[in-house]
């Protein structure tokens, strides 16, 4: 056997798997931004919500039932770096058909910054390309939340497929 073939045979195998432990009828359904907020809060560490910025995604199926919530990034006091590849890999692995984004502002501000808006636009673009729509983006604090889709129009993807 040739050296190249021998090395190829020893290459790391990539295996994708996903198993949802909840029955379909037991999964919570998201019908509005408040439902999403309440679900996100159940998995948020209250000790960190005013300490460090975190970014999470909610994975939804065709019926807007929650498949799960994934923490994508955890950062400092006023920022975190979102790995776009990790975000969409998580969604694709779970066979999600829609996403809701959420992050907290440790300052308690519920205003979308310019960086928040640019990131939302970028993720909407990529989601459109992957046929995986980004449905909303929430900012969460101890005192409440703000929904991008409730206060502004979600960005329209510019990609032509």
Q: Model-derived features: where do they sit?
A:
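Active-site-proximal loop/helix of nucleotide/amide-processing enzymes and allied scaffolds
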Residues: 1-22, 61-63, 77-161
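Glycine-rich, small/polar surface segments that engage phosphate groups of diverse ligands
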Residues: 26-86, 90
